[in-house]
Curated annotation (Swiss-Prot):
Main location: cytoplasm
Gene expressing this chain: rnc
Protein species of origin: Vibrio vulnificus (strain YJ016)
Gene Ontology biological process terms from the UniProt entry: mRNA processing; regulation of gene expression; rRNA processing; tRNA processing
A GO cellular-component term linked to this record: cytoplasm
Annotated binding of Mg(2+), by residue: 40, 113, 116
Limits of the DRBM domain: 154-224
PROSITE patterns in UniProt: DS_RBD, RNASE_3_1, RNASE_3_2
Limits of the RNase III domain: 5-127
Protein name: Ribonuclease 3
Class of this enzyme: hydrolase
Record key words, sorted: Cytoplasm, Endonuclease, Hydrolase, Magnesium, Metal-binding, mRNA processing, Nuclease, RNA-binding, rRNA processing, rRNA-binding, tRNA processing
UniProt cofactor(s): Mg(2+)
A Pfam cross-reference name: dsrm
Length: 225
């Protein structure tokens, strides 16, 4: 293996017996007719099973509805994309010229798909018990943080419900700045809430993410203040 891939395998916590499986997992359909979508399909199912099995045993008294909500939070695209960024996957993806130009290596959907493809590749390179250990290691902090009965709703929804429950006006979100090129922008959003001294500022790679970041900070201030 060359040095960059060795760095990635250290991040993943797994040394492949068949390097070609990892190469395939990192190959987007825009780059080659042999790409990672079949591995992604396999990895998606394995991830769902491993997380469901872990939640079932970790929370023996929790009902199906809560477990489903927790699993959905853990396996959704933005969680997988966060994992991909933690591994630095964008530096290793094989993309076609169009995707490279448009910043595909930063796109949540491409990063999430690659994480699922790597899970599928690890399974084919080893077995279910090995891939279970790898996935649970990746998810250790998230599994510790997630709680049954706690709303898995996004911050904007939780903030809206918090304010409605106290008969307060809904927040007003305003984009105050956008910087960077079209495929690599940073949005700054102010969240104005009646009764707060000043707006709460959030930033993100899209307007939605910046609004969610601002809502999360506003919730922290409202609940801790």
């Amino acid at each position: 293996m060359n040095s960059p891939i060795e760095k990635l395998t250290r991040q993943l916590g797994y040394q492949f017996q068949d390097d070609e499986l990892l190469n395939l997992a990192l190959t987007h359909r825009s780059a080659n007719s042999k790409h990672n979508e079949r591995l992604e399909f396999l990895g998606d199912s394995i991830l769902s099973f491993v997380i469901a099995d872990e939640l079932y045993h970790r929370f023996p008294k929790v009902n199906e509805g809560d477990m489903s909500r927790m699993r959905a939070t853990l396996v959704r695209g933005n969680t997988l994309a966060e994992l991909g960024r933690e591994f630095g996957l964008g530096d290793y993806l094989k993309l076609g010229p169009g995707e490279l130009k448009s910043g595909g290596f930063r796109r949540d959907s491409i990063l999430a798909d690659a994480v699922e493809a790597i899970i599928g590749a690890v399974y084919l390179d080893s077995d279910l018990e090995v891939v279970r250990g790898i996935v649970l290691n990746w998810y250790a902090s998230r599994l510790e943080a997630i709680k049954p009965g706690v709303s898995q709703k996004d911050p904007k929804t939780r903030l809206q419900e918090f304010l409605q429950g106290r008969r307060k006006p809904l927040p007003v979100y305003t984009v105050t700045n956008i910087k960077g090129e079209a495929h690599n922008q940073e949005f700054t959003v102010e969240c104005d809430i009646a009764g707060m001294d000043k707006p709460v500022v959030g930033r993100g790679t899209s307007r939605r993410k910046a609004e969610q970041a601002a809502a999360e900070l506003a919730l922290e201030q409202l609940t801790n203040g």
